[in-house]
Amino acid sequence: MHELSIATAIVEQAGEIARADGAGDVSSVTVRVGELAGVVPDALHFAFEVARDGTALAAARLVVEQVPAQAWCGECAEEFAVGMPPFFWCPRCDRPSQELRSGRELEITGVET
């Protein structure tokens, strides 16, 4: 379960952000997770509860914002949903796309104290 290592990194980084701001305990952490990032949100929530114990995030909640995978077709300038499993074929012109615009994100976007 690689979500545990991801959750541990989130706890460490959120704690560093809070300390840098001179804050104590963290009440919530918001993360953006792309549809193709390979992260299961439920598993990440569970792992976060384990990783936060004994830290400044012990009572913090994790807010996961899921980002849909979107591709861009250079042939017809269409942006389209890739879906899961991913399908990189333009529904408008029926050609393959080679540009993924979103869906691989895994980033902390907010830390509330």
State the predicted function of each range:
Residues 1, 77-78:
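Intrinsically disordered, low-complexity, mixed-charge
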Residues 1-63:
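Long, charged N-terminal interaction/targeting segments
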Residues 33, 66, 110:
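Flexible glycine-/small-residue-rich
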Residues 65-67, 75-76:
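STAS-like cytosolic regulatory interaction modules
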Residues 66-69, 86, 104:
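Short metal-coordination and nucleic-acid-contact micro-motifs, chiefly zinc-binding Cys/His arrays
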Residues 73-76, 90-93:
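Short cysteine-rich clusters marking metal-coordination/redox-active sites
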Residues 79-80, 97:
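Cys/His-rich microdomains that often coordinate metals
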Residues 92-113:
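Short microdomains enriched in Cys/His and/or Lys/Arg
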